[in-house]
Amino acid sequence: MELTVLYLYAAAVAVLLCSSVDFIQSPSDVFGPVALTEPTPSASRDFGAVVSEAPVAVMRPGSAADVARLLGALSSSSAGPPAPGRRPRAAAVAARGAGHSLHGQAQARGGIVVETRALPRAVEVVRGGGAYADVGGGALWVEVLEACLREGLAPRSWTDYLYLTVGGTLSNGGISGQAFKHGPQISNVLQLEVVTGTGEVVTCSPTQSPELFFAVLGGLGQFGIITRARIPLQVAPPKVRWVRAFYDSFETFTRDQELLVSMPELVDYVEGFMVLNEQSLRSSSVAFPAEVNFAPDFFRSDDDGGGGGSSKKVYYCIEFAVHDFQRQDDSAADHVVELVSGKLSYLRPHAYSVEVAYFDFLNRVRMEEESLRSRGLWDVPHPWLNVFVPSHGAAGFKDLLMGTVTRGDFEGPVLVYPLLTDRWDGNSSAVVPAAPEGVVYIFSVLRSTDPARCGGACVEGILEEHRRLADEACRRLGAKQYLARQPSRAHWRDHFGPSWDRFVARKARFDPMHVLGPGQGIFPRADSSLM
C-alpha cells in the first residue's frame, strides 16, 4: 500500500501520539498537510551498509514549515524530557540527506525519517564584495558548485566527495584539502535556517541566535534540521595545477605536509595518502590524469625510523594543488608549483604535475566511484575509520594502524593529511583533539569490502578491530573520532570531554524531548518506536 499526502497514516500516528497525553485531536490539527509515506528500503540503509534500522514512516517535506509541523507535534506530545527509567512518549526523527552515513546515524528505528532531498534545492547566488549563495539544506554540494560556477564563483571549503547534502556535512564538519587554509565547511557559513527539535523555525548566525547557530554546526543532528544555509563564495579559478609527490619515509612525508600548510599564500589544497600495495597505487591514480611512473618495491625492509617494524615497505604520497587563474601570466601557477616543489624532500624524480579544470578537480572522487562501481565495490559494506590525531601522535597512530592492516588484500585509500586547529571555531559542537602544536592529522581508513571475500562476520571483525584501534588511540594519543557512532554514552562523554556539559545543555534547550538524531546513540531512548 502506497501512502502519499494522506491523512490515513497521519491519523494512526496522531492517535498514538495523542493517546500518550490523554487527549484527542484530528490528524490535520496535529500535522496539517504533511506527507507521510510508508518506509522505503533506502530509509533503513546508508553508505556504510553495516547498520539497518527501519522506521515506520518517511516524510518528504516541501518546506521548512512541513518539518516544523512534524517536530512541533512530536515534541508537544509530552510535557517534558523523559525521566530516568521512564518511557519517552515522542517518536524519534532522523534527517536523511544523500544517505552517506556510515553507522546508521541517519536512521530512526520505529520512528520517522525526514528525507531532506525533498526540500527546495534552488541555489541563489548573490554577487558583490561579500558574495554568497543561499542553498537548501537538501542540496548536494555538486549542485551548489555547478550553480556557483555559472557565476564564476565557488565556496571555499569542500569535502572530497561532492554528492553529499549541505545539511549533512554541516551537521558533521566537512573537511578536505582546503581545510588547512579556510577551515572546515562548518567554519564557512554565514547564516542558517534551522527547525529545532521543538518545531521552531529559526534563522540564525554568529550574531543572531548564535547559540543555535553554533550548536547545529557539527552538532550531529541533535539540535535541529538544517533547511537552508548561506555559504560565502570566492572567485573560482578556471584551472588547478595538481601535484603528487612520493615518499618512503613517514617522517619526511608529514614534515613536508606541515611545510605546505604553512604556506597558504601559495598553496590552495593539501592532502596525502598511504601506498600500501599495488592496488592502492592503481586506485588512487584513477582520477589523476598524468602518467605516474612510480614502481615501489613493497618488499624492501621498512627502516624509516617510524617504529613500525614492518617487513614490507610502506610508501606515501603528498597531493597539493595551486589555483590557476590564467590572468596576465599564464605560467604563474607553474612558477608557484616549481617554487613549492623545490622546498620538498620527496623521492626524486617522483613528482608529477597536471593541469585540470577546477570542476574536474573538485569532482575527482566521482571517477573513483565509477571505477569502484564497475568492479562491484561501491554498494558494499564500508567499515570506515576516521580519526583526528594530534601531530605529535601521528607516527604512533600510523604504527597502530599498520599493526592491524593486512596489506596484501586491503582495498581502499588511507588518507593522511594535516589540519590547523585555529581554523576550527570552538563555539561549534564539533570536536577536534587538543594539540599544543596547533596541528592535527586526519587518518581516514576507507575500506571497501568485497562480499565474495568478506562476509558479515568479516565486516564485524573489521569494525571491532577499528573500535579497539580507536579506543587505544584516544587513550594513548589524545585522538578523537570523526563521523563515528560511539558504542555507549560513556564513550560519547569521553569523546566530548570538557564540552560534554555544553552539548547536554544545548540538547535540553533545543530538543528537550530527545526527538532528533536517534541513530547517533548519544541520548538513549527507552523506546523510540511509534508501534
Kindly label every feature range from the protein language model.
Residues M1-M531:
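Noncatalytic alpha-helical scaffold of FAD-dependent oxidoreductases
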